[in-house]
């Protein structure tokens, strides 16, 4: 199972959520959202994505984190869902973020098992 690159953030997600919460509750100020442009993520990872796309084997299965953490219609990658952080910092997943990926891996393994 090959897992493609994950979107990453330039800021610590949990710290940013804390600051956002303080600004909104104490000062009624809106802090910027915690997301990145999908196009930026793709362009920053274009080389490795192209290399991974060239890999092909009947026993190679691919997981695309951008399908899990990015909204194609909004063209944004998210780092929190309903106030729950999916990343513990700029690049590491929280348990909630890891659960999303783990569920996808389990689903893929079950699909592979059912095909045999």
Could you describe each region identified by the protein language model?
Residues 1-116:
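Extracellular glycan-modifying ectodomains
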């Amino acid at each position: 199972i090959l897992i493609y690159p994950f979107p990453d953030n330039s800021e610590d997600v949990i710290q940013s959520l804390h600051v956002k919460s303080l600004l909104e509750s104490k000062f009624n100020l809106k802090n910027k959202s915690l997301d990145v442009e999908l196009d930026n993520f793709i362009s920053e990872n274009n080389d490795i994505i192209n290399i991974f796309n060239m890999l092909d084997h009947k026993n190679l299965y691919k997981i695309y984190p951008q399908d899990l953490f990015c909204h194609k219609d909004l063209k944004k990658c998210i780092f929190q869902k309903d106030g729950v952080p999916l990343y513990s910092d700029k690049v590491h997943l929280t348990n909630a973020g890891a659960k999303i990926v783990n569920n996808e891996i389990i689903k893929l393994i079950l699909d592979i098992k059912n095909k045999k």
